[in-house]
Amino acid sequence: RWASRNAAFVDLMVRTGLRLTEQASLLVSDVPEISGRGYSRFWLSGAVAKWGSARWVYVPASVLSDVSAYVDIDRQSVVRMARSRGDYEGSTQAVFNRESGFVTTVIGDGVLARTRVGNLSPTERLRLMVESDEGLEPAALWLSETGHPVAVSTWKDLFRQANARCVAKGAKLHAHAHLLRHTFAVLTLEQLQRGHIAELSKLLPEQRSQYVRV
C-alpha cells in the first residue's frame, strides 16, 4: 500500500518539478480533475511556492491517475480507520471549506477568523481539517499509515531509507528530492530542444541560413 503512495509521490515530483516542501503541503483539493487531455493543471500559491513563485503546475494524465487512485483507495482507507479510533474528534481549530476556499480558525475564547487557503504557509496547510457528511478528516493530500499528514522530515527519511536499502542490496542507485527536480529540468529542456529542432526542419534552407546568421 505505502509503496504505491510513495511511488505516486515520487512520480509527481519528477514529472512536475515541485520542490519537496511544495509537494508535501498539497491538499486533496489541489488535485485537478482527470480530463481527456494529456495534462491537467493546478495553481500553486505564492505562500507555498519557494520565493513566492506562484505558478501553474502541469500534471501528466498518467501521474494524475495514480495520485487519484491513491486518494480514492489507500488514503480513504486510513481516514476511515482514523475516524473509527476517534483520532479526528475535536480537531476543529482550523477547518477548510473546499467550496468557498476559506479557512475558519478558532483564535481563542470562541473568536473565529477567516482567511483564504492561498494565504497559508505549508506548515499551516498541514493543520487544516475538512468536514463532510462522514465526519472530519485532514485536508492534506499525503497521509501516513495512521491517517495524519506526512511531514517534510518524514519524506526525507523515506529517501534516506530507500538509499540505504539500495546500498545493502548492492544497487548503484541514489536519489533525493532535489535530484528529482533536476531530472525534471533536464527532461523539460530535452523536450524543448526536440520541439525547436522539429520547427527548424520545417523551414526552407534560405530561412534556416537567415536564422543561423541572426
Task: Give each language-model segment a name.
Residues 128, 148-149, 156-213:
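Short, basic (Lys/Arg/His-rich) helix/loop patches that form interaction surfaces
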Residues 25-130:
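Conserved tyrosine-mediated DNA breakage-rejoining catalytic core shared by Y-recombinases
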Residues 12-25, 191-195:
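A short, glycine-centered helix-capping/turn motif at helix boundaries
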Residues 42, 139-144, 176-177, 211-214:
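Extended hydrophobic secondary-structure segments that form protein cores and membrane-embedded regions
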Residues 1-7, 119-143:
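Alpha-helix-centered segments that form part of catalytic cores
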Residues 56-72, 81-89, 139-140, 155, ...:
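Active-site/pore-lining binding-face segments in mid-to-C-terminal subdomains
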Residues 5, 19-20, 50-55, 181:
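Short, cationic motifs built from Arg/Lys/His that form the positively charged side of catalytic pockets
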